[in-house]
């Protein structure tokens, strides 16, 4: 097995799905958290000048959070067994990534704690919030129905086994639920799924011990 180094800021953000996959698989890795004071000096070392980035054996670099997550999910057995199962895990994961991406854009627009602020007009925060809310209205009902297709929604998206899709449901909705605890009130199966992910023995241990960050 290669040695892994995960490069990202000291946030959950777009790297958290990879951390959850490492935890679920019980695989050790170097969780390199970059401080803002370091970033400008090392930006050019990163593919596309962006993070997160997954490094294997100190030589192979994989950028783009979902490409990284899919690689790890395949390596660790959390990506489905057949091509059709993997396609299902992928579209579910991508749907939740859309929610997470819009939330992070909204957070960046509206929260001065964000490390990098874009120039913006006075309406950008409300516009990004409207986009996030519309994305949730579009995706969450579909995810509730998709979950219901396996065992009436009483297990995981792929049935008995937890996959990357279930972990994406957890991490994409974590911060939004902190802000609006009732956002899943119309989606009880998704809420129960998040509780099952939290209760998974390795996930439970990881969530208790991980670094505490704002997002």
UniProtKB/Swiss-Prot annotation:
UniProt keyword list: Eye lens protein
Gene Ontology molecular function, alphabetical: glutathione transferase activity; structural constituent of eye lens
Domain GST N-terminal: 2-80
InterPro entries: Glutathione-S-Trfase_C-like, Glutathione-S-Trfase_C_sf, Glutathione_S-Trfase_N, GST_C, GST_superfamily, S-crystallin, Thioredoxin-like_sf
Intrachain S-S bonds: none
Top-level taxonomic group: Eukaryota
One Pfam family in the UniProt entry: GST_N
GO biological process: glutathione metabolic process
PROSITE patterns for the chain: GST_CTER, GST_NTER
Tissue-specific expression: Lens.
Location of the GST C-terminal domain: 82-215
Task of the protein: S-crystallins are structural components of squids and octopi eye lens. Contains relatively little if any GST activity.
Family: Belongs to the GST superfamily.
PANTHER family: GLUTATHIONE S-TRANSFERASE
Protein name (Swiss-Prot/TrEMBL): S-crystallin 3
Organism listed in the record: Enteroctopus dofleini
């Amino acid at each position: 097995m290669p040695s892994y180094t995960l490069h990202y800021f000291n946030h959950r953000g777009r790297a958290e799905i990879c951390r959850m996959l490492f935890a679920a698989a019980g695989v050790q890795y170097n969780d390199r958290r970059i401080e803002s004071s370091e970033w400008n000096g090392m930006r050019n070392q990163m593919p596309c000048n962006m993070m997160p980035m997954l490094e294997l054996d100190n030589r192979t670099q994989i950028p783009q959070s979902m490409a990284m997550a899919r690689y790890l999910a395949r390596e660790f057995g959390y990506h489905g067994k057949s091509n059709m199962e993997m396609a299902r895990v992928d579209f579910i994961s991508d749907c939740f990534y859309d929610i997470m991406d819009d939330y992070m854009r909204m957070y960046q627009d509206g929260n001065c704690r964000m490390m990098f602020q874009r120039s913006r007009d006075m309406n950008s925060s409300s516009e990004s919030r409207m986009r996030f809310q519309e994305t949730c209205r579009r995706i969450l009902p579909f995810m509730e129905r998709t979950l219901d297709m396996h065992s009436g929604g009483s297990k995981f998206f792929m049935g008995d086994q937890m996959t990357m899709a279930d972990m994406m449901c957890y991490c994409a909705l974590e911060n939004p639920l902190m802000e609006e605890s009732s956002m899943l009130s119309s989606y009880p199966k998704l809420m129960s799924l998040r509780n099952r992910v939290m209760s998974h023995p390795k996930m439970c241990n990881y969530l208790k011990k991980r670094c505490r960050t704002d997002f």
